[in-house]
Regions:
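Conserved alpha/beta-hydrolase "acid-adjacent" motif
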Residues: 151-157
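Active-site loop/oxyanion-hole signature of alpha/beta-hydrolase fold enzymes
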Residues: 21, 30-65
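Conserved HGGG/HGGXW glycine-rich cap/lid loop of the alpha/beta-hydrolase fold
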Residues: 1-41
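Active-site nucleophile elbow and catalytic-triad environment of alpha/beta-hydrolase enzymes
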Residues: 118-134
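Short beta-strand/loop motif that positions the catalytic acidic residue
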Residues: 138, 144-146, 150
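The conserved beta1-alpha1 loop
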Residues: 4-8, 69, 146
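Gly/Ala-rich beta-loop-alpha elbow adjacent to hydrolase catalytic centers
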Residues: 68-76
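Flexible "cap/lid" loop of the alpha/beta hydrolase fold
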Residues: 45, 49, 77, 81, ...
């Protein structure tokens, strides 16, 4: 089985290395880098969040389980909705999953993100993705992993996603 790893908003693909090193060799492991993020060269056709999402989804070309953290979970949901024949499972770690987080009174990550990642495009933090109405159509096995001390994606978000 192919395992595809999607990083959070930093785009740091090395985030996954400690986990990947522990996995058996019979899994194919693919880490998708985000063009223009964390030292990955920019792509001339990526000018919006939708462009980046479409780029990520286009990288998935064989049956796979997606393992995604934070912002990567939004790309994983997009891929699952668009490539139902190829996505065989989801592991979502502390992600919004594309729902509106206002009801959860979460800490806004955008200001701190802008200060830390000055090179990131403005559209990355201003875009609001809403997949909530489509989440109930996802029928594949999904594992939700949350920490109970996360101010950006608190455990209540994971509990809510589990109910959908």
């Amino acid at each position: 089985m192919n395992l595809i790893f999607l990083a959070g908003a930093s785009g740091n693909t090395q985030f996954w290395n400690p986990l990947i090193e522990q996995l058996p060799n019979n899994y194919t492991k693919q880490v998708i880098a985000y063009p223009g993020f964390h030292g990955t060269a920019a792509h001339p056709d990526i000018h919006s969040f939708d462009d980046l999402s479409n780029y990520v989804v286009a990288q998935i070309q064989q049956p796979s389980i997606l393992i995604a953290q934070s912002m990567g979970g939004i790309f994983a949901i997009a891929a699952t909705l668009q490539k139902t024949d190829l996505i065989k499972g989801l592991v979502l770690i502390a992600t919004s999953g594309g729902i509106n987080l206002e009801r959860f009174k979460v800490q806004d990550w955008r200001q701190l993100y802008r200060q830390e990642y000055l090179e990131s495009p403005d559209w990355f933090v201003t875009t609001k993705v809403d997949y909530e109405e489509f989440l109930s159509t996802i029928e594949i096995e999904t594992l939700l992993i949350w920490g109970d001390q996360d101010p950006v994606s608190p455990i209540e978000v994971g509990q809510y996603l589990n109910q959908i």
